[in-house]
UniProtKB/Swiss-Prot annotation:
Compartments, record wording: Host nucleus, Host nucleolus; Host cytoplasm
Function per UniProt: Escorts unspliced or incompletely spliced viral pre-mRNAs (late transcripts) out of the nucleus of infected cells. These pre-mRNAs carry a recognition sequence called Rev responsive element (RRE) located in the env gene, that is not present in fully spliced viral mRNAs (early transcripts). This function is essential since most viral proteins are translated from unspliced or partially spliced pre-mRNAs which cannot exit the nucleus by the pathway used by fully processed cellular mRNAs. Rev itself is translated from a fully spliced mRNA that readily exits the nucleus.
Span of the annotated motif Nuclear localization signal and RNA-binding (RRE): 34-50
Record-level Gene Ontology MF annotations: DNA-binding transcription factor activity; RNA binding
Coiled-coil ranges per UniProt: none
Protein name: Protein Rev
Renumbered residue ranges of the record's region Homomultimerization: 18-26
Entry note about domains: The RNA-binding motif binds to the RRE, a 240 bp stem-and-loop structure present in incompletely spliced viral pre-mRNAs. This region also contains the NLS which mediates nuclear localization via KPNB1 binding and, when the N-terminal sequence is present, nucleolar targeting. These overlapping functions prevent Rev bound to RRE from undesirable return to the nucleus. When Rev binds the RRE, the NLS becomes masked while the NES remains accessible. The leucine-rich NES mediates binding to human XPO1.
Span of the annotated motif Nuclear export signal and binding to XPO1: 73-84
Basic residues: compositionally biased ranges: 36-47
Additional detail: HIV-1 lineages are divided in three main groups, M (for Major), O (for Outlier), and N (for New, or Non-M, Non-O). The vast majority of strains found worldwide belong to the group M. Group O seems to be endemic to and largely confined to Cameroon and neighboring countries in West Central Africa, where these viruses represent a small minority of HIV-1 strains. The group N is represented by a limited number of isolates from Cameroonian persons. The group M is further subdivided in 9 clades or subtypes (A to D, F to H, J and K).
GO terms for cellular component: host cell cytoplasm; host cell nucleolus
SUBUNIT field: Homomultimer; when bound to the RRE. Multimeric assembly is essential for activity and may involve XPO1. Binds to human KPNB1, XPO1, TNPO1, RANBP5 and IPO7. Interacts with the viral Integrase. Interacts with human KHDRBS1. Interacts with human NAP1; this interaction decreases Rev multimerization and stimulates its activity. Interacts with human DEAD-box helicases DDX3 and DDX24; these interactions may serve for viral RNA export to the cytoplasm and packaging, respectively.
């Protein structure tokens, strides 16, 4: 893996193998039995799956030395966010080409269809 030492790669591969074994140790239950029995099996399977998810996250964070989730993106306050159709209307990739729409009417991405 680019930019890291081989020792870290070996640790990461070992962690991935362990996580794979954990997930393989919890197969989904067979669909037989009464409705209540199936529901209980699914509930227990889901609980085990959640435990495996948290254990896997802990293994990866200890192996990588950082949380698996990226740092959340800082967004401006909601009051400053707006959609203004007069600035750019559809046609991504062609911004700044042609005449801008300045009419007071809303943009039409799809034209009015005719029913036959």
């Amino acid at each position: 893996m680019a930019g890291r030492s081989g020792d870290n790669d070996d640790q990461l591969l070992l962690a991935v193998r362990i996580i794979k074994i954990l997930y393989q140790s919890n197969p989904y239950s067979k669909p037989n039995g009464s409705r209540q029995a199936r529901r209980n099996r699914r509930r227990r399977w889901r609980a085990r799956q959640n435990q495996i998810d948290s254990i896997s996250e802990r293994i990866l964070s200890s192996c990588l030395g950082r949380p698996a989730e990226p740092v959340p993106l800082q967004l401006p306050p909601i009051e400053r966010l707006r959609l203004d159709c007069s600035e750019d209307c559809g046609n991504s990739g062609t911004q700044g080409v042609g005449d801008p729409q300045i009419s007071g009417e809303p943009c039409m991405v799809l034209g009015a269809g005719t029913k036959e």
